[in-house]
Each structure stands twice: as structure tokens, then as C-alpha cells.
Amino acid sequence: MLKPLGDRVVIEAISKDETTASGIVLPDSAKEKPQEGRVIAVGSGRVADNGERIALEVKEGDKVIFSKYAGTEVKVDNNEYLVLRESDILAIIG
């Protein structure tokens, strides 16, 4: 399993349907890059100027929306993940 460092978060993207409402199957080239995912792991937090560690606001299991082109894609044990900074996360979905 991945253990992110600092203020980084590991996300598993949630893919949208591959077919439109009218039944057209979308090729990979026409699909939007996912912007929604589930938090798999979180780092220990960022270090403030005074040396204190500030905990992250997101936690494992949170469903989040993130910036479209944020982070680095990694593949571990045939699973694809996205490693990004907490600041690239736009919102937690209730």
C-alpha cells in the first residue's frame, strides 16, 4: 500500500459511465479525466513555519472533488491511484 508523505493524499478515481444517456459508447479519447475520487491514504500533514505539524482536513474514506490535472498517476498491484497535495482537493462530498 502507498503511504503518502507530508500534505500528500492518495486518491482512487471514480470513473463515470462509459455510455451516454442515448446509448453511445465513448472511446477513451472522448472521456473526461475523472475529478471525483475516494481518499485511500493521507500523509502526516504539512509543517508550519513554527515547526508544528498541521493535520490534513481530509481522511481515509472521504469522497472528494479535485482539480482536473492535479497530481501524479501511479500504478500499484494493477490498481491506478492519483497522488496529489491536499491543496489540489477542492471539496469533500457530504
Curated annotation (Swiss-Prot):
It holds the Pfam family Cpn10. It is found in: Cytoplasm. The keyword Repeat does not apply. It comes from the Bacteria. GO terms for cellular component: cytoplasm. Keywords: Chaperone, Cytoplasm. InterPro entries: Chaperonin_GroES, Chaperonin_GroES_sf, Chaprnonin_Cpn10_CS, GroES-like_sf. The keyword Glycosyltransferase does not apply. One of its GO terms (biological process) is chaperone cofactor-dependent protein refolding. Together with the chaperonin GroEL, plays an essential role in assisting protein folding. The GroEL-GroES system forms a nano-cage that allows encapsulation of the non-native substrate proteins and provides a physical environment optimized to promote and accelerate protein folding. GroES binds to the apical surface of the GroEL ring, thereby capping the opening of the GroEL channel. Heptamer of 7 subunits arranged in a ring. Interacts with the chaperonin GroEL. This is Co-chaperonin GroES. It comes from Brevibacillus brevis (strain 47 / JCM 6285 / NBRC 100599). The gene is groES.
